[in-house]
C-alpha cells in the first residue's frame, strides 16, 4: 500500500552523481524544512520518460518556484551515473535534481514498486509526491502506461 497524504517520508538514502563522485543523500535530512516535488519514472532513457515526463518538469521548472517549491527531483530505479547522463541528455541538470534509488528502497517504502517484466525488472511506478518539511502533502500514482496526474502540469495545478 502506498504512503498517503499526511505521512512522513521514509528515512532512506538515495544517490546523486556529482562531477567527482557519487554522493549519498538521506531523504529526510535532504528534505529538511523545504517543500519538494519528486517524481518517479520507470526508467531513464525510456520513451515516455525521456520524451514527455522529465522534459515537462524541465520546461515548467520556473513555475514551481512561483508555487513555493524549493526543489524538484526526478528519481528512478537506476544508478547515479545513468541518472546524471540522462539528465545531461534531456537538459535537466541545473534545474531538476537527478536521484538514483538503485535498489528500489524508497520505491518499496512508498509502496510504488511494480514488476516491469524481464527487460526492466522491479521498478517504481510512474508517480509524483509533494512533501513539505518531510510530510507528504500530495501524491499521484499512475496506472500502467499512463501519464496524467504525475505530469508537471498536473502537479502545478494541484499546488494551486
Model-derived segments and their meaning:
Residues 1-160:
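Chalcogenol-based redox active-site neighborhoods
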Amino acid at each position: 500500500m502506498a504512503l498517503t497524504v499526511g505521512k512522513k517520508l521514509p528515512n532512506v538514502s538515495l544517490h546523486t552523481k556529482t562531477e567527482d563522485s557519487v554522493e549519498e543523500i538521506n531523504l529526510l535530512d535532504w528534505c529538511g524544512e523545504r517543500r519538494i516535488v519528486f517524481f518517479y519514472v520507470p526508467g531513464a532513457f525510456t520513451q515516455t520518460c525521456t520524451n514527455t515526463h522529465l522534459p515537462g518538469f524541465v520546461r515548467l521548472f520556473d513555475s514551481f518556484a512561483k508555487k513555493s517549491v524549493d526543489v524538484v527531483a526526478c528519481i528512478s530505479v537506476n544508478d547515479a551515473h545513468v541518472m546524471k547522463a540522462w539528465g545531461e541528455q534531456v537538459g535537466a541538470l541545473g534545474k531538476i535534481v537527478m536521484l538514483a534509488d538503485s535498489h528500489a528502497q524508497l520505491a518499496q517504502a512508498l509502496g510504488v514498486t511494480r514488476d516491469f517484466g524481464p527487460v526492466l525488472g522491479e521498478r517504481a511506478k510512474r508517480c509524483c509526491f509533494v512533501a513539505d518539511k518531510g510530510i507528504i502533502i500530495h501524491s499521484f500514482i499512475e496506472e500502467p502506461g499512463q501519464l496524467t496526474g504525475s505530469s508537471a502540469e498536473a502537479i502545478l495545478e494541484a499546488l494551486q
